[in-house]
Design a protein with these regions (language model features):
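Active-site-adjacent structural elements in enzyme catalytic cores
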Residues: 1-193
Length: 193
């Protein structure tokens, strides 16, 4: 059922290492469109892509050893990196500035989805824009009112903090959202603002 959903433009909710995520096959524009509609998310707010190392070179471009150092230190885990998108990616995956937010997730359910679908997955939080993130499958069900095709129940998630988002596009990397991984921890690897 889950594999079929990934191959047929379906939207799934699933546990991650932070909150429940919402997404599906990242290469299907219809999935991205449905995620925006379900979340009532403004189209100018880009979506995050959860990936594994083997997909990363096809998604993003970088030539900075600090990025490799960050990946080695914090991945898999709750660090989202904003990198230059591969220009060959479908437009629905690229931000207007040619970037892509990516994370190599440590969550077994999300890793399983990537493996089952043989694709990276959209992995934004499973909540309505402006509402609290969901820590249980029941919260996802109640908040999103049956708009999701499949909900994978991973129990109650304990972290209750979002991933840290780090923009790696300038000489001085910038923390855009403080989350599980602190600026102090990142500064041990490379300087950030």
């Amino acid at each position: 059922m889950v594999k079929t959903a990934l191959l047929h433009n379906k939207v799934l909710a699933f546990p991650t290492e932070t909150f429940y995520g919402l997404g599906g096959n990242a290469f299907f524009k219809e999935v991205a469109d449905r995620v925006y509609n379900i979340k009532e998310r403004p189209r100018n707010k880009p979506l995050l892509v959860l990936t594994t190392p083997e997909w990363l070179p096809g998604l993003c471009l970088w030539n900075d050893s600090r990025i490799d150092d960050l990946m080695n230190a914090f991945w898999p885990g709750p660090l989202t990196l904003i990198l230059a998108a591969n220009p060959e990616l479908p437009q629905h995956l690229q931000n207007s500035d040619g970037t892509l937010a990516v994370r190599y997730t440590s969550a077994p359910a999300a890793q399983c989805l990537i493996e089952l679908g043989s694709c990276p997955i959209i992995g934004t939080s499973a909540n309505l824009t402006g509402m609290p993130e969901c820590s249980t499958a029941t919260e996802v069900h109640n908040q999103l009112n049956n708009k999701v095709d499949v909900i994978i129940d991973g129990g109650e998630l304990e972290e209750n903090r979002a991933s840290t988002i780090l923009n790696c596009q300038n000489n001085l990397f910038e923390v855009l959202r403080h989350g599980v991984i602190t600026s102090a921890e990142i500064n041990l690897i490379c300087e950030v603002s």
